[in-house]
C-alpha cells in the first residue's frame, strides 16, 4: 500500500463518527443537537449513559492508534514522519468527518490514541494533568485544553529526563500543531467557561464544584 492510499485510509478511519452513530442507534437522538452538541464521549455519556460514553471513548482512541500502528507495520520505510502524518490525518478526519458534512468532534481522544502508540509516557503525564484540572474545575473541556497544551512539554521533559533520549522534533512539532488545533475546536467551550455557562460532565456536579471552589 503506497503512501497516499494509506494516508487516505487514516483520514477515513478517523472520520468514522462513532459517537453520532451510537447515540442515533441506541437512543434515537442526534447528538449534534443536544447538550454540548459535540459527538464525543463526554456528550454521549452525559446524555444517553456513561456505558455508551466509555464505548465511544475507546473507539475514538482506537481511531488514533490504529493508523499509526498499521503504518509502522505495512509502511515501515515511512518511519516516524509518516506515522505522524497518518496520525494527523486520523485526527483531522475526526474533526472534519465527511460522514457529517465535514464537521466533527474535538479530536482529543483520537489525539491521545495517536501518541499513546508513539509516546506513552507523555500521554500518561497528559492524562494526569487532565485529571487534576477536571477534579478541581469539573470541566472535561478545560481538562482537555490543559492536557493538550502540556503534552508537548511533558513529552520533552520525559524524553530528556526519564528516557535519556533526544527529543524528536517531528513528534514535538506535530504535538504543537495538533494541540493548537484542539484549542481551536474548543473555542466555544472557552467562551462558555468564561461566561459560566459551560456544561459539567456529570449532572449535579455544578453545585458540588462551586461549593468546593468556594471552600478553597
Curated annotation (Swiss-Prot):
Alphabetic keyword roster: Cell inner membrane, Cell membrane, Lipid biosynthesis, Lipid metabolism, Membrane, Phospholipid biosynthesis, Phospholipid metabolism, Transferase, Transmembrane, Transmembrane helix
Major site of localization recorded for this protein: membrane
UniProt topology in membrane: Multi-pass membrane protein
GO terms of biological process kind: phospholipid biosynthetic process
UniProt entry tagged with the keyword Transmembrane: yes
Pathway linked to the protein: Lipid metabolism; phospholipid metabolism
InterPro entries assigned: G3P_acylTferase_PlsY
GO cellular component terms, A-Z: plasma membrane
Membrane-spanning intervals of the chain: 3-23, 48-68, 82-102, 112-132, 142-162, 166-186
Compartmental location: Cell inner membrane
Reaction(s) this enzyme catalyzes, per UniProt: an acyl phosphate + sn-glycerol 3-phosphate = a 1-acyl-sn-glycero-3-phosphate + phosphate
GO molecular function annotation: acyl-phosphate glycerol-3-phosphate acyltransferase activity
Enzyme Commission number(s): 2.3.1.275
PANTHER family xref list: GLYCEROL-3-PHOSPHATE ACYLTRANSFERASE-RELATED (PTHR30309:SF0), INNER MEMBRANE PROTEIN YGIH (PTHR30309)
Protein role: Catalyzes the transfer of an acyl group from acyl-phosphate (acyl-PO(4)) to glycerol-3-phosphate (G3P) to form lysophosphatidic acid (LPA). This enzyme utilizes acyl-phosphate as fatty acyl donor, but not acyl-CoA or acyl-ACP.
The protein's assembly and partners: Probably interacts with PlsX.
Family stated for the protein in its record: Belongs to the PlsY family.
Name this polypeptide is given: Glycerol-3-phosphate acyltransferase
Protein's organism: Leptospira interrogans serogroup Icterohaemorrhagiae serovar copenhageni (strain Fiocruz L1-130)
Amino acid at each position: 500500500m503506497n503512501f497516499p492510499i494509506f494516508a487516505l485510509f487514516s483520514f477515513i478511519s478517523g472520520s468514522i463518527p462513532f459517537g453520532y452513530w451510537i447515540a442515533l442507534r441506541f437512543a434515537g437522538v442526534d447528538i449534534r443537537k443536544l447538550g454540548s452538541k459535540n459527538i464525543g464521549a463526554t456528550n454521549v455519556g452525559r446524555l444517553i449513559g456513561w456505558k455508551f460514553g466509555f464505548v465511544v471513548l475507546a473507539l475514538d482512541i482506537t481511531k488514533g492508534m490504529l493508523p499509526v500502528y498499521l503504518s509502522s507495520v505495512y509502511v515501515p520505510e515511512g518511519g516516524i514522519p509518516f506515522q505522524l502524518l497518518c496520525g494527523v490525518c486520523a485526527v483531522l478526519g475526526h474533526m472534519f468527518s465527511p460522514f457529517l458534512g465535514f464537521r466533527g468532534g474535538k479530536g482529543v481522544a483520537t489525539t491521545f490514541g495517536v501518541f499513546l502508540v508513539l509516546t506513552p509516557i507523555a500521554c500518561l503525564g497528559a492524562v494526569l494533568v487532565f485529571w487534576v484540572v477536571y477534579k478541581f474545575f469539573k470541566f472535561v473541556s478545560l481538562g482537555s485544553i490543559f492536557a493538550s497544551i502540556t503534552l508537548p512539554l511533558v513529552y520533552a521533559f520525559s524524553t530528556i529526563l526519564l528516557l535519556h533520549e533526544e527529543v524528536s522534533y517531528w513528534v514535538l512539532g506535530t504535538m504543537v500543531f495538533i494541540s493548537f488545533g484542539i484549542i481551536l475546536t474548543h473555542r466555544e467551550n472557552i467562551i462558555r467557561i468564561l461566561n459560566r455557562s459551560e456544561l459539567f460532565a456529570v449532572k449535579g456536579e455544578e453545585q458540588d464544584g462551586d461549593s468546593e471552589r468556594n471552600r478553597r
